[in-house]
Structure formats: structure tokens, C-alpha cells
Amino acid sequence: MIGMGKIRARREGERGFTLVELMVVMAVIMLLLTVAIPAYLQSVKRAKEAVLKEDLHTMRTAIDQYTVDKEKAPQGLDDLVQAGYLKVIPMDPMTSRSDTWMTSESDTLMDINETQGGIDDVHSGAQNLATDGTSYNTW
């Protein structure tokens, strides 16, 4: 039992890592993950917000164009698809669903030639806060 407390040197031909080496590598990996994961999640959120802004712009433009062309506002987002102004109702990137869009209807006519009221704006159905502190459903 003379050599039990001593760390023995590696002999030629022995392979592997010591427990200390493995612990150091794991600590470095954990440190990198604590920095990388929040940055990744933030960039995913910003990307979803960019998609939301683009989808809202596209749908609002389609609503306006439909209103001018048909001389009446669409009664729902499905009208925009049926008339060919949108291929499909886009999926809300914040709710991951296409049926959560909130439309606002107006009895006020948007165009001088318009004969019937209908939807005049669309918003996300998400209740969460954006990176700028505003609620998605106010965009």
C-alpha cells in the first residue's frame, strides 16, 4: 500500500482523459452555452418580429387594394384569399397559428366609392411583449 496516495504517471500506450480534464472541458462548454443560448433565443425572437411586421404589411396592403378594387371592404381575411389578394392567410409567427389574427371592423367607409363597411385593419392575436416593450397585438 505504499503507492496508493500518489497519482501515477501515464504509461506509454495508455489512453484517456483524467477526471480533472473532463471537468474543465465541461465547465468551458457550460460557460459558452450560458452566453450562446440567450443570444440565440433573442435572435429568433427578432426574426419572428420581422416576419410579423412583413405579414401585417402584406395583409394591410391586400385589405386596402381589395377595398379600392371591389369598392367595399373585405368582410374577413378569407375574402382576401378567395379574391386572390393573398395566396393563404399567413401563420402568425408569435402564435404559430393562422386563425389568431384579430381584425378591426369599421362602419366608416375607407374609399369614396366604397358601398359597404368591413375590416380595415389586422393585428396579431399574441398577448406577449415585443423587444421594444409594446404588445404584439398593438402593431
What residue spans do the PLM features occupy?
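Low-complexity, acidic interaction segments enriched in glycine
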Residues: 57-139
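N-terminal single-pass transmembrane signal-anchor helix
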Residues: 13-40
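Regular, well-ordered alpha-helical segments
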Residues: 34, 42, 49, 61, ...
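Aliphatic-rich helix starts adjacent to a transmembrane/signal segment
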Residues: 39-56
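N-terminal leader/signal peptides at the extreme start of proteins
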Residues: 1-15
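A generic structural signal for short
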Residues: 8, 17, 51-52, 64-66
